[in-house]
């Protein structure tokens, strides 16, 4: 019942919204779902900072991140997730270059092999038990891939992973190297598995990227993988080689606790979401939710 209410509410927002985003033509306005203004930032964490400063009314971000910051850190006493409002249901995947199927197949193989061990242990350590979706009987759709991408990675001696700061996925950066995070520890476990299984000596390197430029970094071989809470979409799957899904996620609305009463029922959400200044990360799934 909760899911039905949420989906109906989102549909109502889409149908009845008064579209007035700044700087857009009438034709462009009609492609937006809700809000009176849309502001784009470099990261999801930036949207929370702007929310805490009252520069925006609503932050649309990943539930994985929202759940963490609503309980932990500088914003825990200020922000809250709007109950029962799921704007999109998604899964995370790891993206390689479109033709690097053999390489991504090895990533799949390792993820599946670790499903009942390190994967669960790391997920529990970061409070993500309910978001885990891998099983040890998950089928690797790329198992028969025989291109040269894996051999090229082995020859290079390293796997370069593009990241942004995104707790509990990737955080606590020391000398530009992330030291904590679900994806960080999982990536290290995957590389350790591959080293042992194939008697290779791959090192994992992490490179801070601009999320809005992630596809370019991947195509230009600045990085080998986008492994940072990447939502699987049809468009991304058509342009990149994406792993099996490894984490469930939702797009949710985060507001100040002091304003939470404005979003306490469907009617209030409908009115106040449509009159709100919305903040999103550039190039994110949250932005796509607002732009549909």
Descriptions of predicted regions:
Residues 26, 86-141, 184, 188-193, ...:
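Extended ligand-binding regions for polar small-molecule ligands
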Residues 30-31, 156-165, 180, 267-288:
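Short loop->beta-strand "edge-of-pocket" segments that line small-molecule binding or catalytic clefts
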Residues 27, 31, 70-89, 98, ...:
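Acidic, polar ligand-binding/catalytic clefts
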Residues 55, 60-63, 70-74, 111-118, ...:
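Sec/Tat-exported extracytoplasmic proteins
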Residues 45-53, 64-68, 101, 105-113, ...:
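Solvent-exposed, polar/charged alpha-helical surfaces in well-ordered, non-transmembrane soluble domains
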Residues 1-9:
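Positively charged n-region of N-terminal signal peptides that target proteins for export
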């Amino acid at each position: 019942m909760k899911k039905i209410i949420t989906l109906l509410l989102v549909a109502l927002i889409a149908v009845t919204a008064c579209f007035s985003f700044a700087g857009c033509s009438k034709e462009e306005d009609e492609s937006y779902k809700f809000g009176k203004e849309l502001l784009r930032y470099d990261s999801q964490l930036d949207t929370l900072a702007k929310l805490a400063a009252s520069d925006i009314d609503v932050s649309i971000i990943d539930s994985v991140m929202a759940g963490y910051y609503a309980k932990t850190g500088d914003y825990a006493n200020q922000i809250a997730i709007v109950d029962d409002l799921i704007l999109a249901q998604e899964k995370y995947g790891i993206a390689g270059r479109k033709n690097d199927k053999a390489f991504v197949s090895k990533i799949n193989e390792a993820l599946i092999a670790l499903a009942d061990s390190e994967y669960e242990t790391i997920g529990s350590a970061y409070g993500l038990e309910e978001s885990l979706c891998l099983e040890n009987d998950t089928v690797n759709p790329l198992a028969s891939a025989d291109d040269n991408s894996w051999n090229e990675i082995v020859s290079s001696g390293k796997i370069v992973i593009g990241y942004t700061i995104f707790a509990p996925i990737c955080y606590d950066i020391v000398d530009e190297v992330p030291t904590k995070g679900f994806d960080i520890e999982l990536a290290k476990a995957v590389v350790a598995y591959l080293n042992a299984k194939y008697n290779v000596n791959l090192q994992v390197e992490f490179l801070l990227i601009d999320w809005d430029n992630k596809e370019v970094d991947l195509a230009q071989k600045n990085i080998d993988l986008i492994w940072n809470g990447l939502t699987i979409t049809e468009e991304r799957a058509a342009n990149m080689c994406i792993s099996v899904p490894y984490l469930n996620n939702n797009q949710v609305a985060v507001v100040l606790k002091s304003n939470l009463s404005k979003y306490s029922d469907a009617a209030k959400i409908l009115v106040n979401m449509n009159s709100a200044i919305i903040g999103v990360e550039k190039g994110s799934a949250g932005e796509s939710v607002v732009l549909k």
